[in-house]
Structures are given as C-alpha cells and as structure tokens.
C-alpha cells in the first residue's frame, strides 16, 4: 500500500474543486 503525501492530497483537492466550478458554470450556461 503506497503512502499518499500531503502534496498529492492538496493537488487532488484543488483539481476536484476546479472541476466542480467548471461543471457548475457549464450547467448554468446549458440551463439558460
């Protein structure tokens, strides 16, 4: 089992946050 460093956790959280923002923006434009 590989140990996950704090840096990888931060990168994963930031990338997930960006994906959520892009998806919400795309959803708003599609619904309008």
Swiss-Prot record:
Keywords: Chloroplast, Membrane, Photosynthesis, Photosystem I, Plastid, Thylakoid, Transmembrane, Transmembrane helix. InterPro entries: PSI_PsaM, PSI_PsaM_sf. Pfam families: PsaM. It is a single-pass membrane protein. One of its GO terms (cellular component) is photosystem I. The chain crosses the membrane at residues 3-23. It is found in: Plastid, Chloroplast thylakoid membrane. GO terms for biological process: photosynthesis. Belongs to the PsaM family. NCBIfam families: PS_I_psaM (TIGR03053). This is Photosystem I reaction center subunit XII. The gene is psaM.
């Amino acid at each position: 089992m590989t140990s996950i460093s704090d840096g990888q956790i931060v990168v994963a959280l930031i990338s997930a946050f960006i994906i959520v923002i892009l998806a919400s923006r795309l959803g708003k434009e599609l619904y309008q």
